Every structure is written in C-alpha cells, then in structure tokens.
Amino acid sequence: MWRLLTRAPAPLWRMHFSDTWAALPTSAGLKTLLPVPTFENVSIPERSKLKFVERVPLVPKVRREPKNLKDIRGPSAEATDFTEGNFAILALGGGYLHWGHFEMMRLTINRFMDPKNMFAIWRVPAPFKPITRKGVGQRMGGGKGAIDHYVTPVKTGCLIVEMGGRCEFEEVKRVLNQVAHKLPFPAKAVSRKTLEKMHQNQKERELNNQNPWTFERIATANMFGIRKFLSPYDLTQKGRYWGKFYMPKRV
C-alpha cells in the first residue's frame, strides 16, 4: 500500500519594510520586468511621412555623363551616422536606386507607420544621375544615346531611410527588412545600438586578429608578385571592396 504523503505548503518569507510586514512569494514566481520607455525627449515633426520624390530633376538642361562606376565603389562618406531617428536601412553594398525603388519605400513605410507617433526621412537625394539608352535596332555609332531615366548612386555604409518616434526597434524591424530585401543591393535594418556594435566588432577583429597573413601584409610585401594584379585602390581599402561588393570578413 502506497502511503499518501501530503505536500507541505510553500513557505512564505516575511521581510520588514518601513514598519510594515509584506509576504513575498517563493523564488519560482519572481519576475524581473524591464522598465517601459517613456519617450519624453522625442519630438514628432509636422510632416512625419516620407516625401514624394521627383522622377526627373528640376533643372533646365541635364548633361549626359559617362558611367562613372566609382560612384558606387568603396565606402560611403555621406549619411553614415544617425541625425534625427533611431532606426534606418543600411546599405551593405553599392548600387543604383531608381525612381521605382523610392516609390516602393515611400508607400510601404507610410502605410505602416503611425504619423502621430512615428516619422521617417530620406537620407539619400532624389534621382539625379542620367542613364542613357539607345533604341532597339539602331546601328552602332552616332554618338551617345538619349537620356532614358535617372538614378541615385549609393555606396556601402550609407543610410537610405531613417525612422524614429515613440516606438522601439522590434516594432519597425520587420517593415524595414521587408523594404531592404527589395533593394538592388544588400541591405538590412539597423538601430543606433546595432550600428555601433557593428563598428566595435570590426575594430575588435582588427585588434585581436591572430592570422599574420592579412591582405594588407601580402599586398604591401608584394608576395608572389601580386602587385601586378592589384590596383592602387586595393592597397588603400585593404581589399575589403571589390567594385560595388563589400567583403566584411576580410581583415
């Protein structure tokens, strides 16, 4: 015969707080909740939504330009840090933004965001670089073709759209990643903390690197005659940028 053993009641620990006794539950029921953000210092502008971007620049005459692929090569020197918002879309490669990409970002973000508690701003200019095309069936020669459309060149590390307001990163991360996957170059959603962490991780990898055979050492010492296959740009950027592509794992 099994003996029915009755469970002893859970003990209650009593502590004295300012001449009053309070019964505390056992440790299994304790929870630590993070404080709710107040957003006291956040100000929402009057026009909180993304503005419409013109398809053609408002100039009297546009000069036809060569390709100038250096516009999308290497790291960006503009729009690399946050200005007003706390969340943004970070470009992880170079490429060109067409007018359709601007409309896709504007419509997707404006439909999602609450204009009373959120705002979004552009960090890249409107399309200004002319791209020429020739008609189908034309013979070769005859000079440069007519202007077909305009694009905006973007480099690696440039912030494209910036968001902020009375919201957290988890609320806008899904929409920003949804927009980033539709862009013509690699991109992802970042916040101020994640962007700083990315820069810190890159510096730590450079300081704590245990592999002595780095790209910079091999190229500087001209091992195996590699200098004849490299350009001065490769020596400056230490091989991290190959045209419009960015290789973050290379130290």
From Swiss-Prot:
Q: Which GO terms describe its molecular function?
A: rRNA binding; structural constituent of ribosome
Q: What is its main location?
A: mitochondrion
* Transit peptide residue numbers: 1-29
The family database entries (SUPFAM superfamilies) matched by this protein are listed as: Ribosomal protein L16p/L10e
Q: Where is the signal peptide?
A: none
Q: Which domain of life is it from?
A: Eukaryota
Alphabetically ordered keywords of this record: Mitochondrion, Ribonucleoprotein, Ribosomal protein, Transit peptide
Question: Among its keywords, does the record have Transit peptide?
Answer: yes
Q: Which residues form a coiled coil?
A: none
Q: Which GO terms describe its cellular component?
A: mitochondrial large ribosomal subunit; mitochondrial small ribosomal subunit; mitochondrion
Q: Report the locations given in the UniProt record.
A: Mitochondrion
The membrane spanning regions, by residue number, are none
One GO term (biological process): mitochondrial translation
PANTHER family per the UniProt record, alphabetical: 50S/60S RIBOSOMAL PROTEIN L16, LARGE RIBOSOMAL SUBUNIT PROTEIN UL16M
Q: What family is this protein classified in?
A: Belongs to the universal ribosomal protein uL16 family.
Subunit composition and interactions = Component of the mitochondrial ribosome large subunit (39S) which comprises a 16S rRNA and about 50 distinct proteins.
Q: What is this protein called?
A: Large ribosomal subunit protein uL16m
Source organism of this protein record: Rattus norvegicus
